Amino acid sequence: MKDDIEIFNVFGDGFDRFAFPGKQYRVTAGCGGEAILIIGSEKTAIIDCGMAYCGGDVVKNIKDKLAEEGRNTLDLAFLTHSHYDHMGALPYIRRAFPEVIIYGSTHCQEILQRPNAKVLMKKLGTAARDLYRPDSKEEIPVDDLAVDIALKDGDMVSLGNETIQAIEAKGHTDCSMAYALEPDGILFTSESTGIVEAGLAINTPILKSFADAMTSLKKCKEYGAKYICLPHFGLIPQDFNEEYWMRFQQGCEDRVKMVQEMKKEGLDADQMLERYRDRYWDPIMEQEQPIEAFLINAKNIIKAALRALDEK
């Protein structure tokens, strides 16, 4: 399991971002998206599974924790969206647990049926492997990337005494989903409602639509979660919940304003990307995201901001 690094210690040494209220456990391995295992009264589930290069380690972490809980199978997997850093390890999950059922949005299901999407995932997954595990030459698998059951907004899936509710949360992508776990009141958000970074900065990776992100923000706020678990981070303090939502909205407005200013200056796409990188990229971030992926996202964030300006 990856070690905590400076960029994650934003709430001080006394706060444990993985101290969940019930039988929820971090089984993350390596860099990239988090993987959270949920032990229900009847079924087990995982929220995302991380990158492919560390897929074998994720499986080991899952098996070890299942054994501690007296279980031996993973029943369900829920995907927040179709990006390689959140579900690249899925082929390893399927091989280790052949009966696992994969859930995601309808659009996520459709994307994973596209050959060009898998080509990109393989490319980015290989770049991540070369960066984080340079001695490895293990092939990055993509053939088993698929959603078995498509969920729509409001759908419920039972784990026994517990339920997981799907909440459509577009903005980051059109395939993004958040998931609410009851009765513990945990909201596992998507990147459509942001990520905490160093210095309590809120990253707003809105690749598709800032308007959709605001809709997702409204829905997630209205859910009224006791606990908020952010992608690429973990839990935030309960007394920070409302401030987090406020900071996320402000962060979105700040990014759109920055792009508006660049547009007024007459900057072209390359110049905008360079300025965006200068403002938001820090080399320490490469411990979690390769620069190639950052730049791909940055281009799309700028395009989404330009669309938001056109819609005003």
Regions found by a protein language model. Give the residues of each.
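Soluble or luminal CAZymes and related metallo-dependent hydrolases
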Residues: C54-D57, I149, K208-D212, G251, ...
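Metallo-beta-lactamase
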Residues: C49-Y53, T163-K170, D174-E242
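A short catalytic or substrate-binding loop motif that flags glycine-/basic-rich loops and adjacent residues
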Residues: T28-C31, L151, K170-T173
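C-terminal regulatory/interaction regions
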Residues: M258-K312
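Conserved beta-strand hairpin/beta-sheet module of binuclear metal-dependent hydrolase folds
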Residues: F8-A67, A178-E191
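Short, electropositive alpha-helical surface patch
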Residues: D239-V256
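Active-site HxH/HxHxD metal-binding segment of metal-dependent hydrolases
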Residues: Y53-G56, D64-K152
